[in-house]
């Protein structure tokens, strides 16, 4: 088995990205090696999403493209995991019988065993657990970045949004104890990470199953005491549970970034009620106002669904009004697509697709205007950037580097002056510069760097490079061991 190559393809949210790092770590711990870029892998793993309709189409389209390779090389293995696998189960084998392994959201640790069993038995293996067997953070991980890392604080969700299938696929919320979370954060910082993102389907409800409703604000403050941790982000909060103690912790903890991604979904109270979102527009806007009062430079982004069943032109106008009032720095906008098994899929009042597309276009145009205005306001500001690898798709053509400012904005920067020597500024290093241009989806900084600080993350990136001829090839971080739980997690309060 040693030396077989693998590739993990990830669809969906940050939870899936984090899970894919665990899948890669599990495979490498079992003797697999990453497939070189552009080559065929011996094992291809799809970590799937089930939130939107195009997720299904994307998976089955990719599986279809792999069929000729599988037919010509029967030893190749294909595995499908994640939310769509949890939902579709045997349907995947009906539609793509050349798949070797199907596993769900609750048993990702079983992947190496299932691959070996499928190979040994020459038969597809379908194993879907109905409850979480092992907390993902106890598994080894192959992190994609030297300078940043995801840290799960909870899995699952207790909300009942009528459009969302996630709770039925990932189960009810289960919280990690704060000591376990902080132990993982400290271990990641010891490895060189500068930035961590706390992950949960609803971070604001963190701690309820532990009997401490204020646990999330306390966790943010505790992260502020971790030496060497420069940036803390989190996703995703829920407006219903967003409390002032969290805003105070964000504003008073220096390494918590001035950034908030808070899903709106709709600006209409009527639609929010049908969505069962448990808050109304005034509450949402009140949170935005209080966040901006505490952190005037905070970048606030959101999610919005267009064309939910029953949405009228007046409802849509309410959404546009919230977008104007909130002045979002950016938004992920989606056309509603019914997901089988959700209450919304059975609702009357389906909106004509042509109307949905027209509204979607208007929303996108308005949000681009708002984003552009917000980003133009950044021109002339001094920003701190952690240089990243692969953030800017055109970096090689433009000669720029890219990275994220503290507020999460993407910045493309030109390295000039004494710092311009090739290789001097590395992914993971921290620089300061001045914004020279604002575009709808990014900032540009073409002036000279004001400061450049080498970091342990940059050192790790440099140490991990392998030289092929004269071309440096950056390597990824080594596999991190999973974090043992200090105490058993309490069962979720239901």
Swiss-Prot record:
Signal peptide: none annotated. The keyword Flavoprotein does not apply. Keywords: 4Fe-4S, Cytoplasm, Iron, Iron-sulfur, Metal-binding, S-adenosyl-L-methionine, Transferase, tRNA processing. One of its GO terms (molecular function) is metal ion binding. Gene3D superfamilies: Methylthiotransferase, N-terminal domain (3.40.50.12160), tm_1862 like domain (3.80.30.20). It comes from Parafrankia sp. (strain EAN1pec). Residues 4-120 form the MTTase N-terminal domain. [4Fe-4S] cluster 2 binds at residues 157, 161, 164. Its cofactor is [4Fe-4S] cluster. The gene is miaB. Catalyzes the methylthiolation of N6-(dimethylallyl)adenosine (i(6)A), leading to the formation of 2-methylthio-N6-(dimethylallyl)adenosine (ms(2)i(6)A) at position 37 in tRNAs that read codons beginning with uridine. This is tRNA-2-methylthio-N(6)-dimethylallyladenosine synthase. Belongs to the methylthiotransferase family. MiaB subfamily. The lineage of its organism: Bacteria, Bacillati, Actinomycetota, Actinomycetes, Frankiales. Residues 376-449 form the TRAM domain. Residues 465-494 are annotated as: Disordered. Monomer. GO terms for cellular component: cytosol. Residues 143-374 form the Radical SAM core domain. Binds 2 [4Fe-4S] clusters. One cluster is coordinated with 3 cysteines and an exchangeable S-adenosyl-L-methionine.
């Amino acid at each position: 088995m040693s030396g077989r190559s693998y590739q993990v393809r990830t669809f969906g949210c940050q939870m899936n990205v984090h899970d894919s790092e665990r899948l890669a770590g599990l495979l490498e711990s079992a003797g697999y090696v990453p497939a070189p870029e552009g080559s065929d892998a011996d094992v291809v793993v799809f970590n799937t999403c089930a939130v939107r309709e195009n997720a299904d189409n994307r998976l089955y389209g990719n599986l279809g493209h792999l069929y000729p390779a599988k037919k010509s090389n029967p030893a190749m293995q294909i595995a499908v995991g994640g939310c769509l696998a949890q939902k579709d189960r045997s349907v995947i084998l009906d539609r793509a019988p050349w798949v070797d392994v199907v596993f769900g959201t609750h048993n990702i640790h079983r992947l190496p065993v299932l691959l070996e069993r499928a190979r040994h038995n020459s038969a597809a293996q379908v194993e879907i657990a109905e409850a979480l067997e092992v907390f993902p953070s106890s598994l080894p991980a192959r992190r994609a970045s030297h300078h940043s890392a995801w840290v799960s604080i909870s899995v699952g969700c207790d909300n009942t949004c009528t459009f969302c299938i996630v709770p039925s696929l990932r189960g009810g919320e289960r919280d990690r104890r704060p000591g376990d979370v902080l132990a993982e954060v400290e271990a990641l910082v010891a490895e060189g990470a500068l930035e961590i993102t706390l992950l949960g389907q609803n971070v604001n409800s963190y701690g309820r199953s532990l009997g401490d409703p204020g646990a999330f604000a306390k966790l943010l403050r505790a992260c502020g005491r971790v030496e060497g941790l420069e940036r803390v982000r989190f996703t995703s909060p829920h407006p219903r549970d967003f409390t002032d103690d969290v805003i105070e912790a964000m504003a008073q903890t220096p390494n918590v970034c001035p950034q908030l991604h808070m899903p709106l979904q709709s600006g209409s109270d009527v639609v929010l009620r049908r969505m069962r979102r448990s808050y109304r527009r005034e509450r949402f806007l009140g949170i935005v106002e209080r966040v901006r009062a505490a952190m005037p430079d905070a970048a606030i982004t959101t999610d919005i669904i267009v064309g939910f069943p029953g949405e009228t032109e007046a409802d849509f106008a309410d959404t546009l009004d919230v977008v104007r009032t909130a002045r979002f720095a950016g938004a992920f906008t989606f056309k509603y697509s019914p997901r089988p098994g959700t209450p919304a899929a059975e609702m009357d009042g389906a909106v004509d697709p042509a109307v949905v597309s027209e509204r979607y276009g208007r929303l996108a145009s308005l949000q681009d205007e708002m984003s552009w205005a917000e980003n133009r306001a950044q021109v002339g500001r001094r920003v701190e950037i952690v240089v990243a690898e692969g953030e800017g798709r055109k970096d090689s053509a433009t000669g720029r580097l890219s990275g994220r400012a503290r507020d999460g904005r993407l910045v493309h920067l030109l390295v000039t002056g004494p710092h311009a020597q090739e290789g001097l500024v590395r992914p993971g290093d921290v620089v300061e510069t001045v914004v020279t241009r604002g575009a709808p989806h990014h900032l540009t900084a073409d002036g000279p760097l004001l400061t450049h600080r080498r970091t342990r993350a940059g050192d790790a990136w440099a140490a991990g490079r392998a030289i092929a001829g004269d071309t440096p090839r950056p390597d990824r971080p080594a596999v991190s061991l999973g974090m043992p739980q200090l105490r058993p997690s309490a069962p979720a309060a239901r």
